[in-house]
């Protein structure tokens, strides 16, 4: 990814660092409009997810997470920007005339060939079941349920590692550090998701954040006591508590929010960091 640094001509561009290489020119038969209803509200119009609203209109790109074009090779034609995710996508032309979008693997360039199936080479961008992969393979776009499509390791720069295979299950180390079991029949894509330098981008100004549909975040310490536990006091006052809390009084830092006795606990060998 090529990072473009703005010249400090105005205050809004002084800290800007954006990607200026990948453009978007999607195929009309692979996109559709998506009504972004609610924007953080529930059916009654009450805010349930704070700091959401506004944003530019988007067209959703149909991404092939299943990779069910078995044993048919495809060629990468374009690498495009997708406003719905921080990873890039690439358009694939398959030998049977099918055209689909997939997540862009790191290092893939226009003209490369990919294929999915059971007995395909272990090379970047190819999709195959975990049972056919050697230990230590770096993978992304991993299925949890057979045939449902990839659900794990899909963000920009994400990569998981196949560390063991025993019985009907395979053991994976996910990007979060979690170690969990997945069925060996589930498929995954070889390699790492592209756009690994996404954390080097800097929007530079508040307006760019608003284009993404993210509203300003107000500190609780500057609110009134009726609005936040940190609020109130004379002048610039501390939060008045031993530990920071959420607007609803729960511990804000380090509190585990995962549901106890969740059905998937039996598949998790080590929790995320």
UniProtKB/Swiss-Prot annotation:
GO terms for biological process: mitochondrial translation. This is Large ribosomal subunit protein uL2cz/uL2cy. The keyword Ribosomal protein applies. Signal peptide: none annotated. GO terms for molecular function: rRNA binding; structural constituent of ribosome; transferase activity. SMART domains: Ribosomal_L2 (SM01383), Ribosomal_L2_C (SM01382). Part of the 50S ribosomal subunit. One of its GO terms (cellular component) is mitochondrial large ribosomal subunit. Belongs to the universal ribosomal protein uL2 family. The keyword Plastid applies. Keywords: Chloroplast, Plastid, Ribonucleoprotein, Ribosomal protein. Residues 1-20, 224-254 are annotated as: Disordered. It comes from Nuphar advena (Common spatterdock).
């Amino acid at each position: 990814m090529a990072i473009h640094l703005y010249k400090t001509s105005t205050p809004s561009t002084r800290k800007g660092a954006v990607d200026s290489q990948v453009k978007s020119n999607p195929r009309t038969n692979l996109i559709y409009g998506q009504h972004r209803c609610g924007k953080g509200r529930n059916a009654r119009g009450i805010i349930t997810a704070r700091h959401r609203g506004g944003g530019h209109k988007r067209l959703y790109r149909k991404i092939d997470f299943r990779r069910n074009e078995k044993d048919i090779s495809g060629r990468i034609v374009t690498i495009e920007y997708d406003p719905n995710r921080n990873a890039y996508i690439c358009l694939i032309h398959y030998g049977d005339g099918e055209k689909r979008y997939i997540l862009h693997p790191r290092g893939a360039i226009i003209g490369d060939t990919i294929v999915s199936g059971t007995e395909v080479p272990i090379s970047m961008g190819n999709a195959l079941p975990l049972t056919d992969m050697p230990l230590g393979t770096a993978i992304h776009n991993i299925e949890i349920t057979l045939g449902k499509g990839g659900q794990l390791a899909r963000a920009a720069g994400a990569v998981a590692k196949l560390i063991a295979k025993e019985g009907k299950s395979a053991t994976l180390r996910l990007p979060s550090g979690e170690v969990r079991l997945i069925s060996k029949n589930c498929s995954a894509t070889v390699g790492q998701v592209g756009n690994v330098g996404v954390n080097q981008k800097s929007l530079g100004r508040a307006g760019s954040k608003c284009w993404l549909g993210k509203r300003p975040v107000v500190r609780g310490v500057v609110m009134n006591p009726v609005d936040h536990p940190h609020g109130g006091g004379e002048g610039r006052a501390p939060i008045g508590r031993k530990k920071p809390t959420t607007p609803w009084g729960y511990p804000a830092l380090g509190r585990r929010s995962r549901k106890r006795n969740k059905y998937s606990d039996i598949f998790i060998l080590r929790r995320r960091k």
